[in-house]
C-alpha cells in the first residue's frame, strides 16, 4: 500500500489530497480531500502581487495541511502552485517564507508542466483508441489543454485565460483568438473527438446537470445551464443552486470557456471524471517511486 499526499495551490482555492495506490498500476484511491477558499488570483491578476493578508492565509493553510500530512505518513508528497503564483511578482518570495516557517517546499510550475500533470489523469475507459481525446482544464487563471490520440500525446498548451481572469475582466482580448486557432488547428482532421473536463467548475456543472458516472454531458445541456446561471445574480445562484460564494461568481465565465472550446473542436459531449491537478500529482509521485508509468 503506497501513500501519497499532494497540495494544489490554485488561483481560487488551495487543495490537499491524501491518497493510496494498492497495486503498481492501480488508480489512486482518495482517502481525504480538503479545500480552503483562498482567492490568490484576485490579488495576482489585479495587483500583480499577493497581499500580505492572502500570503498569511496561505501560510496558515499550508501549516494546517502539514499536520494532516504528518499524521497520514505518506511515502512522498508534493506541493505545486499554478497561475496566480506564476503571475505574482512576489510568488517566489512567498514560497520561500512558507518553506522557512513550515518546511513545506512549493514548486511554482509553468503551464506546460501543469498540463503534463493533468495528462496523467487520462481515463482510458471513457474513449476508444480510434477517437482523439481533448483534455480541458479551466482554472482560475489559466486553461490547459492536451490532445491525445492512440495513447500518445499529440499537442499540449496553456493559455492565460481562466474563470477569475474573465470575471475580473483581466484576460487579454486577443487570447480568445489564440485559443480558437490552437483548438481548430490541432483538432482538424479527426473524425471523432472526445472532450474530458477537469476543474472545480466543470465538476459543479456536471452535478447541476445531474450527470451520471461514466456518462458524458451534452454541449446542449451545458449551454442550457449556462444560460440559466447567466440570468441570475450571484446571490440568486447561491440560494437557488446552493453554490459556494467563491463558485457562484466564476462558474459562468468558466462555462463560457468550456463551451467555446467544445464548439471550436466539434465536441458534442464532455466527460467529467471528477479529477484535477492533485490527482495527476499523486500519479506523478507514484511513477517516480515505482518506475511504473500511467501514461
What is each of the regions a protein language model found here?
Residues 79:
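Dinucleotide-binding Rossmann-like beta1-alpha1 core, especially the glycine-rich loop
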Residues 7, 36-38, 136, 159:
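Preference for bulky hydrophobic residues occupying beta-strand positions
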Residues 8-13, 136-142, 198-201:
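A short acidic Gly-Thr/Ser loop motif
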Residues 4, 18, 43-74, 82-96, ...:
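Helical "lid/coupling" subdomains associated with nucleotide-phosphate turnover
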Residues 25-44, 70:
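Conserved ATP-binding subdomain of kinase catalytic cores across diverse folds
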Amino acid at each position: 500500500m503506497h501513500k501519497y499526499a499532494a497540495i494544489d495551490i490554485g488561483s481560487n482555492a488551495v487543495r490537499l489530497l491524501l491518497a493510496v495506490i494498492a497495486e503498481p498500476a492501480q488508480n489512486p484511491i482518495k482517502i481525504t480531500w480538503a479545500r480552503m477558499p483562498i482567492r490568490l488570483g484576485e490579488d495576482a491578476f489585479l495587483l500583480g502581487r499577493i497581499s500580505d493578508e492572502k500570503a498569511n492565509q496561505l501560510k496558515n493553510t499550508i501549516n494546517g495541511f502539514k499536520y494532516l500530512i504528518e499524521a497520514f505518513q505518506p511515502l512522498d508528497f508534493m506541493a505545486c502552485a499554478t497561475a496566480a503564483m506564476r503571475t505574482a511578482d512576489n510568488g517566489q518570495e512567498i514560497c520561500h517564507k512558507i518553506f522557512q516557517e513550515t518546511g513545506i517546499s512549493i514548486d511554482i510550475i509553468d503551464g506546460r508542466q501543469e498540463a503534463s500533470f493533468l495528462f496523467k489523469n487520462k481515463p482510458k475507459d471513457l474513449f476508444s483508441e480510434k477517437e482523439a481525446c481533448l483534455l480541458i482544464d479551466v482554472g482560475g487563471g489559466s486553461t490547459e489543454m492536451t490532445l491525445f490520440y492512440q495513447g500518445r500525446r499529440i499537442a499540449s498548451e496553456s493559455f492565460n485565460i481562466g474563470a477569475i481572469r474573465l470575471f475580473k475582466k483581466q484576460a487579454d482580448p486577443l487570447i480568445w483568438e489564440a485559443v480558437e486557432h490552437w483548438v481548430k488547428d490541432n483538432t482538424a482532421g479527426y473524425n471523432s473527438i472526445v472532450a474530458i473536463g477537469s476543474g472545480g467548475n466543470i465538476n459543479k456543472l456536471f452535478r447541476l446537470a445531474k450527470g451520471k458516472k461514466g456518462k458524458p454531458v451534452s454541449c446542449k445541456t451545458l449551454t442550457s445551464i449556462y444560460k440559466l446561471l447567466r440570468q441570475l445574480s450571484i446571490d440568486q445562484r447561491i440560494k437557488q443552486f446552493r453554490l459556494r460564494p467563491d463558485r457562484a461568481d466564476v462558474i459562468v465565465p468558466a462555462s463560457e470557456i468550456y463551451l467555446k472550446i467544445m464548439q471550436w473542436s466539434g465536441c458534442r459531449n464532455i466527460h467529467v471524471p471528477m479529477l484535477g491537478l492533485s490527482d495527476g500529482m499523486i500519479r506523478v509521485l507514484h511513477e517516480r517511486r515505482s518506475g511504473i508509468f500511467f501514461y
